Amino acid sequence: MLTDPSARLAAMPKALRDYALIADGERGILVGPHGEHAWLCFPRWDSEPAFAGLLGGPGGYDVRPVCDRFVWGGYYEDHGLIWHSRWVTGEGAIVECREALARPALADRAVVLRRCRAVRGGARLRALLDVRPGGARMRDLHHRDPYWTARAGGARIRWRGAGEAVVREGADGGAVLAVTFDLAEGESRDLVLEIAAESAGEPPADLDPGALWEATERDWRAAVPSCDDTAAPRDARLAYGVLTGLTSAAGGMAAAATTALPERADEGRNFDYRYAWIRDQCLAGHAVAAHGGPPHVLRSAVGFVTARLLADGDRLRPAYTVAGGAVPGQRPSALPGYPGATAVTGNRASAQWQLDAVGESLLLLATAAEHDRAEPGAREAARVAADAIARRWHEPGAGIWETEDRLWTHSRLICAAGLRQAARVLGGPADAAAWTSLADAILAETTRTALTPGGRWRRAADDDRVDAALLIPPLRGALPAGDPRSAATLEAVRAELVQEGFVYRYRVGDEPLGVAEGAFTLCGFVLALAEHRAGDTARALRTFERARSGSATSGLFSEEYDVRQRQLRGNIPQAFVHALLLETASRLAD
C-alpha cells in the first residue's frame, strides 16, 4: 500500500452554513464545499458514523477538482434532495458534481450517486473513498471490473466508476481508494457507491447509474410538489425535501441529521438529535396538512405517533429511535468532536416527561382526521392521550425547551388546544364533552396561576418571563381568535424577544439577547404565524423574510442563528424549523 500525501481526505471542518444534505429517509450525508462527504451514519440515522470527518473522526468520500485554486457554490434541484456541488477553477473551468442518495431506500443498504460533469472547459478531478463504519478500516479490497469491493466493520462495499483507482495509505494508516480522472468539456462520469450491511440479502446484479438516477428522480418528483401556491416556493420545496429525506420507512422522522454540533462554543450545549421527537413529528404533519401536498410525511407522522401512544400511554416518551425504540441516555463519544464541543451520543430527553408532546399528539390526530389521514387506531390513541393529560397535567415536566421540571404554561395550553380539536373531530358525544370540560379546567387553572397582572402569559407560575413558545397554543385553538391574553403575549414577545427582526425564545438571566444563545429560528416563523393570525399580514411577511434569512447557503436551517456572526448554531438540518417554514409559507399565501 503506497503512502500518498494527496490521498488525504478533507480534514478541516467547515462553518455549518457551508454544508448541504442529501438523504434517503434512512440516513443522510452532509456534503461540504470541497466535495467532501463529511458525515454519514450507517445503516440508519443513529448508528455509528461511516464518514465522521465532521466530528474529527475517520472516514469520508471526497470528489473535487485537482487544481491549486477553485471557488465553491452549489444548489438543489427543484424536487428533493438532489444537490449540485459546483466549482469554478483558477484556470476558468466550471465543474459540477450532481449528488444524491438513491431512492426508494432500503434500511440495510445505502447507494450514493455522484455524477461529475465538466460544464465549461476540461477538468481533472480526484475521488477518495474511505468507508469506516464505527471506525473500522476497509479490508479485503479487490477490483473486478466494473467494481471495487471491500469490507469494513459489518458492511460490504461496492464502488463503480473508479476502475483505475489505486489503494493508498490514508492519514491513520488505513486503506484509501484514490482515483484521478480527466473530463473534456461536456463529458461526465458516474460514481456509484453501495454500502450494505453484512446481513443484507444478495446485492443487485448491477449498480446501473442511469436506472438509479431515474428511480431517484421519479421518487423525489412524487414527494415534492411545486409549492407555487406558497409565499416562498423554492424554500417550501426544500422543506418538503428535508422532511421527506429525514423520514424513515419505519415512520419516525429524525429531528436532525447530526449530533453534538454546538449551540455555543465549549458550554456543553451540544446534543444528539438523530432521533424522532414526537413534538417535531407533529409539527411536520401540521405543516404538510396546512399546505395540502403529498401526504407521505403526514401519514408517517400519524402512524408513528399513533403507535407510540397505543404502546406507551401516559408514559409516552418525548423521543424514540426512528424505528420506535428507546433512545439511550446521553454519553460521551470517542470522536474528537466539532470545534467548540465534545462529541456525544444519546439524549437525556429519553428520561423526561414532556406534557406538551401529548397535547401535540392530539392536535396531529385531529388534523389527520380532518384530512382523511387518520390511522385505524386514531380514536383509541386520542382517548389514550386525553386520559394521559387528565392524569398528569398537574405534574411538572421538562416542557418544549427540555429544561428543568416545572408546570410550564405552554405545555398546559397546548394540551387544552389538543383536547378541543380532538373533541371537535375525533370524540363521540361523551368523549367530546369530557375532553372539552378538561380543556376548560386546564385553561381556567392556567389563567389563575400563569397570567401576569398585565394580562399576558408567563412561562410558568413561578417564572414571570415571556416565552415565544406561548404564541403557539393560540395558533392551534387553545383560545379564541382575538383573545386579549394572546394579544398581550404577542406584544410582549415583540417588545422583549425581538432584536434586529430576529426572535429569541426567552431571556436568559440578565444577559442581553444574543449573548447566551442565538436567535431561535423556529420562533421567527411562529411569530410570523401569530402576526398573520392577528391580521397584520404586512408585519408577518417581514418577520417571515427575516427568519428565512438565517439559512445556510444551501437553504438549510439549524436550530439557532448567531446574528452577530451570521453563523448557524446547533444540529443541521433542524426538521421542525423547516416544518414551520412550510406552514408559514402556506398560510401567508392564503
Each model region followed by its residue ranges:
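Acidic, mature catalytic/reactive cores of soluble proteins
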Residues: 1-590
